[in-house]
């Protein structure tokens, strides 16, 4: 490992497995961001972190967003991923500073795009998202957040306010040395197309979704 003065003006630790390649301005509909591009030499993935404003080291508003082509790009209502990404970018911009780490290689909770589509086909036949993965002989959740922790480390971030409903993300960051000062809910109103999926995330994957009961009553009425 070597130390360097990063683009943000902080001394950061450069780890050889995740290398910062480029920084560029990225104006968006939510506000002005900077895109920090990284290459993960261990996995061969290209990664990006969108940074808004001037970051401190502590309690940085942060979203770790697993890539979801169907939700983020196509507006799929099978999940709430696209709406969560938009909400996270908006909240970071409104807060004046923060980070959205967009995690490539996390498609379908880490099983890949084609496997995810196969799992979605099984869900259309009546299996839930957990049962579908297992029926395909795949892990329920294969995501690793080590690269996210190394990106935060490169940006000089030691603790975060984590926008997530998933306790496993918090646990993973803590294991990798990033303190989670607060877990900030990122709740999206469900629709008829994703209510079963969200219920499974709550009941089988331990996601914190306190708004779901009232929403389920509304959807079924």
UniProtKB/Swiss-Prot annotation:
Q: Where along this sequence does the record place binding of Zn(2+)?
A: 68, 79, 81
Q: What is its EC number?
A: 3.5.4.25
Regions annotated as coiled coil: none
This protein's cofactor list reads: Zn(2+)
* Class of this enzyme: hydrolase
BP-aspect Gene Ontology terms: riboflavin biosynthetic process
Question: GO terms for molecular function, please?
Answer: GTP binding; GTP cyclohydrolase II activity; zinc ion binding
Q: Where is the active site?
A: 141, 143
Which Gene Ontology cellular component annotation is one that this UniProt entry carries? cytosol
Q: Name one Pfam family in it.
A: GTP_cyclohydro2
**Protein keywords:** GTP-binding, Hydrolase, Metal-binding, Nucleotide-binding, Riboflavin biosynthesis, Zinc
Quote the PANTHER family the UniProt record gives.
Answer: 3,4-DIHYDROXY-2-BUTANONE 4-PHOSPHATE SYNTHASE (PTHR21327:SF18), GTP CYCLOHYDROLASE II-RELATED (PTHR21327)
Physiological role: Catalyzes the conversion of GTP to 2,5-diamino-6-ribosylamino-4(3H)-pyrimidinone 5'-phosphate (DARP), formate and pyrophosphate.
Q: Which family, according to the similarity comment?
A: Belongs to the GTP cyclohydrolase II family.
Q: What is this protein called?
A: GTP cyclohydrolase-2
Q: Which organism is it from?
A: Streptomyces coelicolor (strain ATCC BAA-471 / A3(2) / M145)
Its ancestry begins with: Bacteria, Bacillati, Actinomycetota, Actinomycetes, Kitasatosporales
> What is the name of the gene encoding this protein?
ribA
